[in-house]
């Protein structure tokens, strides 16, 4: 089994300065045009998610109280931290 240490993962700051991403893995590896990616993000402020056309996202709240996801034309959803966290899937 392989373990990931967040303290050793490289950090990519978001262009809007509202958060940062720590990439765990992608397929194919080290490609910008990936088929899938697993990452951990830290969100510091309200802001827009970057667009990845055609890519489905699955969001699971790992810590914190709650997070509100809003889209003007698609959905509104509040993620709440639970003992067994729920996920939100969106494009």
UniProtKB/Swiss-Prot annotation:
InterPro entries: RmlC-like_jellyroll (IPR014710), RmlC_Cupin_sf (IPR011051), Uncharacterised_HutD/Ves (IPR010282)
Disulfide bonds: none
UniProt xrefs under Pfam families: HutD
Membership in a protein family: Belongs to the Ves family.
Annotated protein name in UniProt: Putative protein Ves
Gene: ves
């Amino acid at each position: 089994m392989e373990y990931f240490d967040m303290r050793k993962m490289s950090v990519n700051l978001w262009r809007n300065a509202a958060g940062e991403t720590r990439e765990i893995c992608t397929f194919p590896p080290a490609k910008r045009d990936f088929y899938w990616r697993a990452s951990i993000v830290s969100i510091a402020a309200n802001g827009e998610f970057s667009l990845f056309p055609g890519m489905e996202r699955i969001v699971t709240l790992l810590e914190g109280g709650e997070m509100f996801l809003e889209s003007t034309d698609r959905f509104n959803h509040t993620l709440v931290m639970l003992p067994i966290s729920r996920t939100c899937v969106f494009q």
